[in-house]
């Protein structure tokens, strides 16, 4: 029985050694292929420790095997041992050991000491962040590590996922990630509810309904409600009977007060509503109070914007008659600068506005004495389309007629070389440009050119 016991001790030692080697393997090399993102320093340290541990394990195993090889073989049916080695949740690995007798003693104590040493090394590595294999694919941050971007400070944002997976502890903790992963609150105000406007924007309203809309517009500060109310009033102002009703209800000051708002959409809708109201001559008497303010805002707002176009349309309507043109004479240089700088649509609308002034002979002296950019002459080039050419030719024709009718040709010394008078009358460049347009391919432009040339 003594030799059987010794053989059993040898078998137990080999089983324990094999199990320890398997544990070391699982702790060091048995990693998931999907989780190979490690820091370079940690990899170097782990490789050195794993190498030393594996060398030591091999030496111990050779010692045990050498000692067992000196004994006599026993009956296989008695000495054959089957052991399941592996993690508790992992798949079992069957080891079959054929122990042999040996003459030495104390193998059981040596096996226990070896197992204890390997176990301590495994615990030490686990404490430094070595991971045990997990069946679950879910990874959570350990409580000892700061969450990326959280209060504990900071992992690099580009490596958040890899650092979080590599820094998990041996036990899988079923906890949520830090609060920093939650979506941050938006800095922009969110509209809590929609205002139910009592009418549709294209409804034709009666006087009581218009009064309700004006009351809403006067009391609200909500941009959405203001926009809907202004569009509703602007659409109704397209009808002559409602133009009078809005004026009689005191709607012009209520609408015009929104000219001062900073919201460009609200200003655009305000100008559109006033533009429709300005078709009525009595309404123009109410709107003239705000015409200078509209002109200033139109000149300083963003070039070619919708607000600028709406302002130019309102100014054009307000200058169709001669009653309020003198209120805008101080802005003549700005109009010509806008005529040169603006895009196609801004140019056309500005020309229509200036043509209104040229049709009033009383405004001729102020108009031709203002300073204009010399590049304005480029508007007479053939490259422009029919509408721009017809408008610039009309502008030149009206100014030339007014200079003759007002007798300003004899007082040419009053005007500077940078004035519109010098550009159109004295330089002779305009006349050359107009003569060059006589060969234009557009028949309408040709007819207009011939008409202008006959008046020179």
Swiss-Prot record:
Q: Where are the ARM repeats?
A: 198-238, 240-279, 361-401, 418-456
What is this protein identified as?
Armadillo repeat-containing X-linked protein 1
Task: Give yes or no: UniProt keyword Transmembrane helix.
Answer: yes
Q: Which organism is it from?
A: Mus musculus
Instruction: Name the membrane topology term.
Output: Single-pass membrane protein
Q: What does the protein in this record do?
A: Regulates mitochondrial transport during axon regeneration. Increases the proportion of motile mitochondria by recruiting stationary mitochondria into the motile pool. Enhances mitochondria movement and neurite growth in both adult axons and embryonic neurons. Promotes neuronal survival and axon regeneration after nerve injury. May link mitochondria to the Trak1-kinesin motor complex via its interaction with Miro1.
Chain ranges sitting on the Mitochondrial intermembrane side read 1-6
Name the Gene3D superfamilies on file: Leucine-rich Repeat Variant
**Known Pfam families for this protein?**
Arm_2 (PF04826)
Q: What is the lineage of its organism?
A: Eukaryota, Metazoa, Chordata, Craniata, Vertebrata
Show the stretches that span the lipid bilayer.
7-29
